[in-house]
Design a protein with these regions (language model features):
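Cofactor-binding loop segments of dinucleotide-utilizing enzymes, especially the Rossmann-like FAD-
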Residues: 9, 146, 178
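A short helix->loop->beta-strand "cap" motif at the edges of active sites that frequently abuts
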Residues: 2, 34, 137-140, 170
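Helix-loop-strand module that forms the ligand-binding subsite of alpha/beta enzymes
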Residues: 74-159
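N-terminal beta1-alpha1-beta2 submodule of the flavodoxin-like/Rossmannoid cofactor-binding fold
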Residues: 1-99, 104-112, 197-206
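Hydrophobic residues at beta-strand termini and immediately following loops
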Residues: 41, 144, 176
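Short histidine/acidic/glycine/proline-rich micro-motifs that form metal-
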Residues: 11-13, 148-152, 182
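Glycine-rich phosphate/pyrophosphate-binding loop and the adjoining helix
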Residues: 152-206
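Short, well-ordered amphipathic alpha-helices
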Residues: 22-27, 118-122, 162
Length: 206
């Protein structure tokens, strides 16, 4: 039995191509893996702590030797919430990420969430020589990204998500691109339908 974290970086909309493909993937995944535990994290519905001045100052104080209990109440609340997001990622065996491509990059909320999983001392560490090494292993990720244009995985969003996941130790990253719908509007429905079929095929193997 695996624990699957599903990170949704797209507001709900019946027109969302991202969500259509994600739903097809998850429907099939649940059929194939009925005993797995699915935990959904909708970044547009939940409050998760972004890095801000209080987080930076809390990290500085802890690094200087202060205890968590010595931090201000605001620092404690924010850091605890930030750490909860990190721990949620660490507890997952598989991670599914779904997002649209916005200005060649992932949505800002997804970037903020990724900051919570890219944490020195928890998901990676620096060696004595200054080299960064991952602290996670054995995880798998599946990335769904929808885009109106055609980028063939050369966009910054694709490379960023894969790069960070690899950096923290997630070496198995499968990408499903749903793209070209705006560039070829007459083919848009078929592109999405084909992606749904492909998502189900890949769900069987994930």
């Amino acid at each position: 039995m695996a624990k699957v974290l599903v990170v949704i970086a797209r507001p709900e909309s019946p027109k969302s191509r991202t969500l259509k493909v994600l739903n097809a993937f998850m429907d099939e995944y649940v059929k194939v893996h009925p005993n797995d535990v699915i935990e959904k994290l909708d970044l547009y519905k939940v409050d998760f702590q972004e890095i801000d001045g209080d987080i930076f100052s809390a990290w500085d104080e802890l690094e200087a030797g202060r205890q968590f209990s010595d931090l201000t109440s605001i620092q404690q609340v924010k850091l605890a919430q930030f750490n909860t997001s990190t721990d949620q990622f660490l507890a997952a065996d598989k991670v599914v990420i779904a997002n649209p491509l916005i200005n060649l990059m992932v949505p800002t909320k997804l970037k903020a969430w990724i900051d919570t999983i890219n944490v020195a001392g928890k998901t990676f560490k620096y060696t004595d020589t200054g080299t960064a090494v991952p602290l996670t292993s054995g995880k798998k990720a599946f990335h769904i990204q929808a885009a109106g244009g055609k980028y063939n995985n050369q966009d910054f969003g694709t490379q960023y998500v894969k790069g960070i996941l690899n950096f923290v130790g997630v070496q198995s990253v499968t990408k499903l691109s749903v793209e070209g719908m705006d560039h070829f509007p007459d083919q848009a429905e078929q592109i999405v339908a084909d992606a749904e079929i492909e998502s189900r095929r890949l769900a069987d193997k994930f």
